[in-house]
């Protein structure tokens, strides 16, 4: 896969592409796409016996404060193959902090052209509360057994905050490419 040829999305930040690194309900393995080669690498095995509560990946051509592309959790009912590009509507952002600093994860739903199941979801609060609690629980505890690692959930932000995170990520990547 040549990530350089995959656009940010049809109408960013409201409609973005997400390259899936980890499918919904995946085994406890953290995968990451190498941005240069496009190859999928095993980043690490999670020490906790937990499964990902959503399809998980990143928006191409973005750069977040942690030096990686903007992370995205895509809720759904169907696991998506690793390396797939999924058209996504951002509906919120989960603010977190870990041993490396502040970390933001966009919450999205599949675009209605892919799957109309979430057409009524425009903001994170439109999802069932149990869905949000499952996501929070996973990210609050998935590093629990890893030496020196920790996570603190800071709270949720709305879709406009998610759009802002994506816009900042696009601008940061553009500035980084100029250097």
Swiss-Prot record:
It is found in: Cytoplasm. GO terms for molecular function: inorganic diphosphate phosphatase activity; magnesium ion binding. The keyword Acetylation does not apply. InterPro entries: Pyrophosphatase (IPR008162), Pyrophosphatase_sf (IPR036649). This is Inorganic pyrophosphatase. Its main location: cytoplasm. Its cofactor is Mg(2+). PANTHER family: INORGANIC PYROPHOSPHATASE. Mg(2+) 1 binds at residues 66, 71, 103. It is an enzyme of class 3 (hydrolase). It catalyses: diphosphate + H2O = 2 phosphate + H(+). Keywords: Cytoplasm, Hydrolase, Magnesium, Metal-binding. One of its GO terms (biological process) is phosphate-containing compound metabolic process. GO terms for cellular component: cytoplasm. Catalyzes the hydrolysis of inorganic pyrophosphate (PPi) forming two phosphate ions. SUPFAM superfamilies: Inorganic pyrophosphatase (SSF50324). It comes from Rhodospirillum rubrum (strain ATCC 11170 / ATH 1.1.1 / DSM 467 / LMG 4362 / NCIMB 8255 / S1). Mg(2+) 2 binds at residue 71. The gene is ppa. Substrate binds at residues 30, 44, 56, 142.
